[in-house]
């Protein structure tokens, strides 16, 4: 991703604040991208209306869509100085509707807000979020309610020791995409690589096994591999973080 021309901003009709839309606007101002404010709608009572005629069922569906379209148009009205359009789709599986739209209309980026657990103060990924992570063919950016800080940090997670060609290619794509976002957000890029802890069962089953020595050897291998990967992208060792986990 070295350019962003089209952004799909996923709207959550159950929320008053649309953080995904706000971040989309920020990126659009910096990249010149167009935005589509996207929302799925489905009324499950529609499935209970088998006694109605086909025309009556269609009229009911159109009424629901029209109501949501008016609401969405009102939501984006403060941004009329940007190239922003709206799209409401009737679908009972939001992630499928999002992915189909991304494929059909060639979007470069999907931006969606996350949900925060009130008691735990932590981010919760919904089933829709997980489906998008696994299946969406274009990058997905999940955002929280806080604004992006100026001169902030972007952390790119890599698997620096992998010898799998797909993983190696993914590492490079992650770093390149992160570099592009750093340019837009005026941020600093850092890499993080995790290495596995020493298996406890080995230490128990093999008395002469030295877990500390093994752990240091694994850590050293990951440090060297991460630093080498960073060098390919003119990043310093100080921008690399290698942690057990």
Residue ranges and their predicted role:
Residues 1-3, 23, 76-110, 117, ...:
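Structural beta-alpha unit
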Residues 55-70, 210-221:
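A short acidic, glycine-rich active-site loop
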Residues 38-40, 87-91, 143, 192-194, ...:
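Conserved beta-strand termini and adjacent loop/short-helix elements that scaffold enzyme active sites
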Residues 3-5, 99-150:
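Gly/Ser-rich helix-loop-strand patches that form or flank binding pockets
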Residues 17, 65, 91-92, 122, ...:
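A conditional alpha-helix N-cap/helix-loop micro-motif detector
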Residues 2-55, 153-208, 216, 231-232, ...:
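Small/aliphatic-rich secondary-structure junction motif
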Residues 94-98, 128, 225:
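Short acidic active-site motifs
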């Amino acid at each position: 991703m070295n350019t962003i021309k089209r952004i799909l901003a996923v709207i959550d009709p159950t929320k008053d604040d649309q953080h995904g839309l706000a971040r989309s606007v920020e990126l659009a101002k910096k990249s010149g991208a167009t935005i589509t404010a996207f929302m799925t709608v489905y009324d499950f009572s529609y499935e209970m209306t088998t006694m109605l005629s086909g025309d009556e069922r269609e009229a009911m569906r159109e009424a629901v869509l029209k109501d949501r379209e008016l609401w969405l148009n009102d939501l984006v009205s403060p941004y009329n100085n940007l190239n922003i359009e709206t799209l409401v789709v009737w679908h009972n599986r939001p992630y499928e509707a999002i992915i189909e739209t991304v494929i059909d209309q060639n979007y470069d980026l999907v931006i969606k807000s996350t949900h925060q657990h009130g008691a735990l103060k932590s981010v919760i990924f919904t089933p829709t979020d997980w489906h998008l992570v696994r299946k969406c063919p274009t990058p997905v950016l999940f955002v929280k309610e806080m604004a992006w800080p100026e001169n902030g940090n972007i952390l790119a997670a890599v698997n620096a020791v992998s010898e799998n060609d797909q993983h190696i290619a993914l590492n490079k794509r992650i770093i390149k995409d992160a570099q592009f976002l750093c340019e837009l957000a005026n941020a600093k890029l850092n890499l993080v690589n995790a290495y596995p802890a020493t298996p406890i069962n080995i230490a128990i089953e093999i008395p002469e096994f030295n877990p500390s020595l093994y752990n240091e050897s694994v850590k050293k291998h990951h440090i060297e591999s991460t630093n080498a990967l960073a060098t390919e992208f003119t990043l310093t060792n100080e921008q690399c973080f290698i942690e057990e986990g």
